[in-house]
A protein has these predicted regions:
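Conserved, function-defining micro-sites of small-solute handling proteins
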Residues: 1-126
Length: 126
C-alpha cells in the first residue's frame, strides 16, 4: 500500500478529483476543507499528534525594524482580505500571521520540537 504525507493545499485537488483518499489530517483539528476526514489523533493510536506545515516571510538579519514591521503590517493586511482569505481556505490553507518576535519564538519552538523527534527516531544523515 502506498502512503504519503503532503500538505493539504497541494493534495486537495487530487483528493477532490478522487485520485487520492485522505485517511487523516495531521493538524490538531479537522480541516474545514475536508470536514469528514479525521485528525490522526482521532483516527489512530497517536494521541495529541499535531504536525502542520507553515510558511513565513523572513528578512535578512540586520534589516531595520521599521522595514520588518512594515512587511508584517502589509502581510497582515493582505491576509485579512476577505478575497485572499477565502481563496486560501478553499485550498485547504489556514491564513494566519504573527508579530515578528512571536514568529521568531514560534520558529525556535518548532526547531526544538522537530530536533527532539529526529533525535528520538535515531535518524542519521548519510
Amino acid at each position: 500500500m502506498d502512503v504519503m504525507f503532503d500538505n493539504l493545499p497541494s493534495a486537495l485537488p487530487q483528493i477532490k478529483a478522487g485520485k487520492l483518499i485522505a485517511l487523516a489530517v495531521t493538524s490538531s483539528e479537522r480541516s474545514a476543507a475536508l470536514p469528514d476526514v479525521p485528525t490522526i489523533a482521532e483516527a489512530g493510536p497517536v494521541k495529541g499528534f499535531d504536525a502542520t506545515s507553515w510558511f513565513g516571510l523572513l528578512a535578512p538579519a540586520g534589516t531595520p525594524a521599521e522595514i520588518v514591521n512594515r512587511l508584517q503590517q502589509e502581510s497582515a493586511k493582505a491576509l485579512g482580505s476577505p478575497a485572499l482569505k477565502e481563496r486560501l481556505l478553499s485550498q485547504g490553507a489556514l491564513p494566519g500571521g504573527m508579530a515578528p518576535a512571536d514568529f521568531g519564538r514560534f520558529i525556535a519552538a518548532e526547531t526544538r520540537k522537530w530536533a527532539a523527534v529526529v533525535k528520538a527516531s535515531g535518524a542519521k544523515v548519510d
